[in-house]
Amino acid sequence: MKNFALIGAAGYIAPRHMRAIKDTGNCLVSAYDINDSVGIIDSISPQSEFFTEFEFFLDHASNLKRDSATALDYVSICSPNYLHYPHIAAGLRLGCDVICEKPLVPTPEMLDQLAVIERETDKRLYNILQLRHHQAIIALKDKVAREKSPHKYEVDLTYITSRGNWYLKSWKGDPRKSFGVATNIGVHFYDMLHFIFGKLQRNVVHFTSEYKAAGYLEYEQARVRWFLSVDANDLPESVKGKKPTYRSITVNGEEMEFSEGFTDLHTTSYEEILAGRGYGIDDARHCVETVNTIRSAVIVPASDNEGHPFVAALAR
């Protein structure tokens, strides 16, 4: 049994990490968040210590190191995006391996610095890239490898996850903290595309705002038109008033079944990490580079057949 601490315990994604820790037979012994809305801990690990001040959390973690039976093995990080880097560094320097939510960090330069800290501490950093464990994604990757098509696949990626007025007033709506909508809700999709279709060759942005972004990505084996949004007005008429989220991936005009299979992906990710097969800094580098380019890109009009259909609707 491994001992875990969790940073960002009141966040949206934290319960998935808590359950993954429990479901893999391990123990959450300490948790931290500046907010105290963490009642979920009662149903998962009621014996866990909890702190609302980081200094006390660090002191407790350091004290646990005095006994090998209580010392932390892993620190899981679910804090806001802009705090990932300092929290990862703190976890590694505590002498722990670290598991961090996406996006790992906003820039390749920060990845380089974390690699230095890994070497200094002789500990490992793992990123949650859960779509690599989704059975539909694995099946598509295998199909692409098997077919060895001489032509690039034509892919449309659409992801709309409706958010209310609170969104822009939270850290998620502040691009200095979330790094923008394409990073916050899209980074795992860019990792998925790289995982399936190989190296990125072109990265063009056609539209970006605080609510949505769109562009074109060309990989070794695919041409991808993408559209991401947190605006409910972008939902197709077929789902408006029925579902708050719309997720669609078409490959050569064929809709990929991608509506189920997300429930246990964090647990699968933890199982792989604990078995020594987790995804580290080098695995995350491609998607970090992709979103870093998107954030700084000059917006250009879509060339023929490179613009996502939803972008044309925005211009009307």
UniProtKB/Swiss-Prot annotation:
Temperature dependence per UniProt: Optimum temperature is 30 degrees Celsius for the coupled WbpB/WbpE reaction.
The entry's keywords: Cell wall biogenesis/degradation, Lipopolysaccharide biosynthesis, NAD, Nucleotide-binding, Oxidoreductase
Cystine crosslinks: none
Catalytic activity, reaction form: UDP-2-acetamido-2-deoxy-alpha-D-glucuronate + NAD(+) = UDP-2-acetamido-2-deoxy-alpha-D-ribo-hex-3-uluronate + NADH + H(+); 2-hydroxyglutarate + NAD(+) = 2-oxoglutarate + NADH + H(+)
Enzyme class: oxidoreductase
Pathway the protein acts in: Bacterial outer membrane biogenesis; LPS O-antigen biosynthesis
Keyword Iron: no
pH dependence: Optimum pH is 8.0 for the coupled WbpB/WbpE reaction.
Binding, NAD(+): 11-13, 32-37, 55, 81-84, 101-102, 130, 171-172
Enzyme Commission (EC) number: 1.1.1.335
Single GO BP term: polysaccharide biosynthetic process
Gene Ontology molecular function: any one: NAD+ binding
Subunit structure: Homotetramer.
Note from the entry: Seems to proceed via a ping-pong reaction mechanism.
Purpose of the protein: Plays a role in the biosynthesis of B-band O antigen for serotype O5. Catalyzes the NAD-dependent oxidation of UDP-N-acetylglucosaminuronic acid (UDP-D-GlcNAcA) to UDP-2-acetamido-2-deoxy-3-oxo-D-glucuronic acid (UDP-3-oxo-D-GlcNAcA). Cannot use UDP-GlcNAc or UDP-GalNAc as the nucleotide sugar substrate, and can use only poorly UDP-D-glucuronic acid (UDP-GlcA). Undergoes an NAD(+) recycling mechanism using 2-oxoglutarate as an oxidant.
Family: Belongs to the Gfo/Idh/MocA family.
Protein name: UDP-N-acetyl-2-amino-2-deoxy-D-glucuronate oxidase
Organism: Pseudomonas aeruginosa (strain ATCC 15692 / DSM 22644 / CIP 104116 / JCM 14847 / LMG 12228 / 1C / PRS 101 / PAO1)
